[in-house]
Amino acid sequence: MKTRIGPDGVHLFDRFSGLNVLLDEWRPEEAVWSMSPRQVSIALTNVCDLHCEYCYAPKHKASLHTDQLLGWLKELDTEGCLGIGFGGGEPTLHPDFADICQRAAGETQLAVTFTTHGHRLTPQLVERLKGSIHFARISVDGVGRTYEEQRGKPFASLLRGME
């Protein structure tokens, strides 16, 4: 369990049980507040294998270095951050995605989440992520034909990935 002290009170958080409580009856002095954000969103890569017309991701390809990223995660954990959310681009396209999630879950007390387009979710990847991911978000921009027009991929393939 993690305890984070901030201007709103004392935040108790446990990524395993789901406990997430803010005790706001006590207002601690500023000198003891955690200086970290509660949650941090990290774009692991800006690489994506979809070509959505509305996407703001840059067209050059770049990914964060795994060891440097894990150093940041450990620092955030030590400073009181409660969780990290990986995004991108498409985070599953980072060459070390599963390893990063496993190490983040094993080497920190951070809740690990990610947002994906869902097309790369295979049984093998899901199996590798078990025990490391606290929840995943799948972006869905419509259904059927609307989805296919927006994303350029078959909606049925998204549904297969979500099974």
Residue ranges and their predicted role:
Residues 1-59, 77:
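N-terminal pre-core extensions flanking Radical SAM catalytic domains
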Residues 7, 11, 27-29, 50, ...:
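A generic structural micro-environment signature
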Residues 55-60, 146-150:
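Acidic/glycine-enriched edge-of-secondary-structure segments
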Residues 57, 65-66:
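Long, mid-chain structured domain cores
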Residues 66-86, 94-163:
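Radical SAM/AdoMet-radical enzyme domain recognition
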